[in-house]
Amino acid sequence: YRQQGYNKRFRMGGNLTYHQPDMGMKILNYGLNVDFLTNQYGDFFIWRSPTEVYKPSPFTNMGREENNFHIDPFINYVNPENGTSHKIKGRFYHSADNIVRPSSGASITDILGNMGTNAQTIQNIAGGDYSSLYPALVGIGSGLINGNLEDAMNGVFTSLGNIFPNATTADYCDLISWVMDNGIPGDLGSIQNGQLPSDLIPWLSNVMNPSRNDSKTKTDKSYNYYLDYQFNKKWDGGAQITTGMTYEHVRYDSSIMDEVYKSDNVAAFFQYDQRFWDRLSVSAGVRAEYYRVDNHYREAETKILGTKVPFRPVFRAGLNYQLADYSFIRASIGQGYRNPSINEKYLRKDIGGVGIYPNLDIKPEKGYNAELGFKQGYKIGNFQGFVDVAGFYTEYKDMVEFQFGLFNNADYSMINSISDAIRMLMDGKGFGIGAQFHNVSKAQIYGMEISTNGVYNFNKNTKLFYNLGYVYTEPRDADYKERNELEDAYSDALQMKEKSNTGKYLKYRPKHSFKATVDFQWKRINLGANVAWKSKILAVDYLMLDEREKQQKDLMDYVRTILFGQSRGETLASYWKKHNTDYATVDLRFGVKATKEVAFQFMVNNLLNKEYSYRPMAVAAPRTFVLKMDVTF
């Protein structure tokens, strides 16, 4: 449904298990699972304009080709006579992927033609007649004198309108993207000395060549080796222990970074479980992890008795108590710790044309979570099922979040000031739009969830299955006040802020969500429906939107207009304000199981044809009809 969007997948796999005979009560089996996936897809992260929501921006005209393969050997041994078991799991995983263009970009002649380029005006400027540029000069002068950026920008766009009378903001993006692909004059430093770049003529000659410079395909490769051993011992009194070790080695060959990264992760774990009075079950465990990347041998440290050790222990505990028949209460608390992955910390990748940029300063995130829940079974007439209610609380320190921004493609640094933008132009590698993972000092996420699932039995051939759930979440940015004070002091027009508003909520999260699934089955026929409802998104990235009150537009507003388009008076900000609301969707499906091996299903997704977005510029699919056939053999 999105222009230039496609997904072609081929998957093949299998498994082989050998059960050792003549073992008596003991059980021994071993084997392996194998899976291969090849995937080609095209997509985009940024639209062309608010009236072309299913068309890609030229900045994000990219797709990927990838091939994945893994083989998972395993060995299981169980001895019921002494209540022990041994399990060994392994995995070798290989992945290779590279960037492709779903379509070739427009040629310079097409771009200039769409913009209605006035050749006479360009010729007049070349001949020394600068009258068409007067509006820009007057506007900039007025802006400098009066401190009014709007006057300056209106003057600039008026002058550009004299040269490109038919141009839209999307056309300017086409032109900028074309120049980024073909480079800019390398000798921009001579402009500071009042001279034209020495390589201007060769560059202009290349610009007038309608063919783009196609770069050589670069393939990223990763290799993953995983081994896990688990020992379990059960006693007649209801006690059991589970212990073991895990080792994982990752090698990543990055063609873009021209580097090879290696990581090792070693973990040891122990868990004790005990059952009392056939009603109460308690559990407690600890896991200690050591992690390193290349020669960084201490990615994580813990102080024990005044001495720093290069591993991190985390603890968890929980209980489950049966109050009555089909009635249970549970509670759990646990620590969490996660090291940034190689992708998050070291790599430069492209996903849908949006770059993922490295951040060597990112730190591990840590925290804890707690949950209290109640589960009750019920049987009312022909209804039977369970209802579950739970409250949860999670607190993070140095929580890892992504932040969208503009980046200098020369050194992959974020453009965070006007001087950074000037340096990007001087470097001559252009800019990129993308995300960088960074730490949010402190975050709290708490809320409650209620759900029920079950079945209504009409007779042995006719049943109604249902699953309903509601989640309330309070995703708090605990340091938002301090961050707002810091951002209020920003003086550079291009300095990036954390999010689109000054509120207390984390980005890209709704407060409320509800989902219901109902399936009516009669013999081989199935009729089902999905109903989903979500509340609006509470905050997004500052690069996309700025919802703060302001007297006049600032420089970033004009940057957003160019990057994300303005068409028929509509901008991303006005579109998001209109469409970032509570929304509901309905999907229907009808299926027939023709034989034991063959089944057909007809689906209507987004039955009400609701136009909604789960993030800026991610407009979901309109009403879609799908016919599906499943064959099992």
Label each residue range with its predicted role.
Residues 87-91, 95, 322, 328-332, ...:
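Membrane-embedded beta-barrel scaffold of Gram-negative outer-membrane proteins
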Residues 234-242, 246-250, 254-394:
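Structural signature of Gram-negative outer-membrane beta-barrels, strongest in the C-terminal barrel
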Residues 2-15, 19-78, 82, 92-113, ...:
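Flexible loop and strand-edge segments within Gram-negative outer membrane beta-barrel domains
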Residues 386, 390-395, 413-543:
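Gram-negative outer-membrane beta-barrel transporters
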Residues 1, 20, 36-40, 79, ...:
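Transmembrane beta-strands of outer-membrane beta-barrel pores
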Residues 1-15, 41-49, 55, 89-91, ...:
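Surface-exposed extracellular loop regions of Gram-negative outer-membrane beta-barrel proteins
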Residues 337-338, 395-398, 402-407, 532-573, ...:
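C-terminal beta-signal and adjacent terminal beta-strands/loops
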